[in-house]
Design a protein with these regions (language model features):
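Short, small-residue-enriched loops and turns at beta-alpha junctions
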Residues: 25-27, 56-58, 108-111, 142-148, ...
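Catalytic-core regions built around general acid/base machinery
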Residues: 33-44, 123-130, 183, 218-223
Length: 267
């Protein structure tokens, strides 16, 4: 995350951004990196809408590699280490205010068993309070796999009674899971933000909307049926957003907003 990219984003008319907490992308634990981001946001009139909590250590942007960390790791030492890492990300709010921390509850291969469930509860019970004290709401994201799917998240919230926990609805992950409409029905009451990207229903490709098989007309109509006006946050692979002018990203935003407006008018 550098000044030239922030400038390009601003010129494209995008005003609110989500930043991914991966050390090569944004070193959230370093005060100098935080100061530079704060300065860039102010200079280009941008707002930090959300941070995506770290999921791996030493992860290069756009790569699926590195040492994974999980707040639902049944092994106590690793879980506490993961929680501490998330707390470092939340501490960014002491310098740069943001509304939401997007959090994965586990990894894609993790089973929804009792040990993982208890570990996630112990972590989030602490993190929700830590976040709230800094003006941040934790939004758990639906992810591919058994433990992070919409049905599992619904069960988790129902049984843990974590009343301040909210959801980030990831439309691409829902498309891979039981479908957009079915996942949204399970999550709609607690959704506060979104991740929008496309795929072909088989793997997590993070394509631009329209490049996969999601029915965006139906999806936007379903999203806009939510009583809250949910923010539309594009979450793309580096390849998809690789055009330095961000023309394709801005075009995708325009199409989404147009589709959303039509959905509201037709409601």
């Amino acid at each position: 995350m550098n000044a030239s990219l922030l400038a390009e984003i601003s010129r494209g008319g995008i005003k609110n951004i989500e930043v991914w907490c991966a050390h090569p992308h944004f070193n959230y634990a370093e005060q100098q990196a935080i100061r530079e981001l704060a300065s860039g946001l102010e200079e280009y009139g941008l707002v930090l809408h959300s941070l995506h909590a770290p999921t791996q250590r030493d992860l290069a942007p756009g790569r699926e590699s590195g040492f994974p960390i999980s707040i639902s790791d049944p092994e106590r030492v690793r879980r506490i280490d993961a929680v501490d890492e998330v707390k470092r990300a939340l501490e960014v709010a002491e310098r740069i205010p943001f509304r939401y921390l997007i959090q994965h509850i586990g990894n894609n291969r993790q089973a929804a068993d009792g040990r993982s469930f208890d570990a996630a509860f112990n972590s989030l019970e602490h993190l929700v309070v830590f976040a709230k004290n800094r003006g941040v709401t934790i939004a758990v994201e639906n992810t591919p796999g058994e433990f992070g799917c919409a049905a599992s998240l619904q069960q988790f919230v129902k049984e843990t009674h974590l009343k301040d926990l909210r959801y980030c609805f990831d439309i691409g992950h829902a498309h891979i899971d039981t479908g957009v409409a079915a996942s949204l029905e399970l999550m709609h009451e607690r959704i506060v933000t979104t991740h929008l990207h496309d795929n072909h229903g088989e793997k997590d490709e993070h394509l631009l909307p329209g490049e996969g098989t999601i029915d965006w007309d139906a999806a936007m109509k379903t999203l806009r049926a939510n009583p809250k006006e949910l923010p539309l946050v594009l979450e793309l692979k580096e390849k998809a957003a690789g055009d330095p002018s961000l023309d394709k990203v801005c075009e995708a935003f325009d199409k989404l907003e147009e589709t959303a407006e039509k959905a509201v008018e037709g409601a």
